[in-house]
């Protein structure tokens, strides 16, 4: 009788069935961009330029700007985007004056072009002009004549956006 009661008890007891569920884990490893020039616009003022002196090698203006990067692992990348002047120059911003642009270089001088555009998404590697001890970046802007075209007088301007990030 005890066996029969035990058998009936076992039959009446429901068996719990466990079902496997998947756990989805997501997120984003976010590398924050650097703050450039304390978040203020950078002004490069050439003043008056004599068109006869625009020979792509003089009249440069060098700027040193502060950079603050909360994440400093890997290499520093810079991205400068703006209207590129034609003629095969990948570091020259077009201005509103025909045949006249502004060439950009990393560091002081004209040995390392500051290439414009997205590059690999983060821009291009910084190879000159970085002073990590002072948290600054130096770049040089140079008046540029495309070809032998005549430069008309007048106010000129161009704009670009700059961002920097470690990656």
Swiss-Prot record:
GO terms for biological process: cell adhesion involved in single-species biofilm formation. InterPro entries: Adhesion_dom_fimbrial, Adhesion_dom_fimbrial_sf, Adhesion_dom_sf, Bact_Fimbrial_Adh_Pro, P_pili_tip_PapF. GO terms for cellular component: extracellular region; pilus. The keyword Signal applies. Keywords: Cell adhesion, Fimbrium, Secreted, Signal. Strains of E.coli that cause infection of the human urinary tract produce pap-pili which are hair-like appendages consisting of about 1000 helically arranged subunits of the protein PapA. These pili mediate binding to digalactoside-containing glycolipids present on the epithelial cells which line the urinary tract. This is Fimbrial adapter PapF. It comes from Escherichia coli. The lineage of its organism: Bacteria, Pseudomonadati, Pseudomonadota, Gammaproteobacteria, Enterobacterales.
């Amino acid at each position: 009788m005890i066996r029969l009661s035990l058998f009936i008890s076992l039959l009446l007891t429901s068996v719990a069935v466990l079902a496997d569920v998947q756990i989805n884990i997501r997120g984003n490893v976010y590398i924050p961009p650097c703050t450039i020039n304390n978040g203020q616009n950078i002004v490069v003022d050439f003043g008056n330029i004599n068109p006869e002196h625009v020979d792509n090698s003089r009249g440069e203006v060098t700027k040193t700007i502060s950079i603050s990067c909360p994440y400093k692992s890997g290499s520093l990348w810079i991205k400068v985007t703006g209207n590129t002047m034609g003629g095969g120059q990948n570091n020259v911003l077009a201005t509103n004056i025909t045949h006249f642009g502004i060439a950009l270089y990393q560091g002081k001088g004209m040995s390392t072009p500051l290439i414009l555009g997205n590059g690999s998404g983060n821009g291009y590697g910084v190879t000159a002009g970085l002073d990590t001890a002072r948290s600054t970046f130096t770049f040089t802007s140079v008046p540029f004549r495309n070809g032998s075209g005549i430069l008309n007088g007048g106010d000129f301007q161009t704009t670009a956006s700059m961002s920097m990030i470690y990656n």
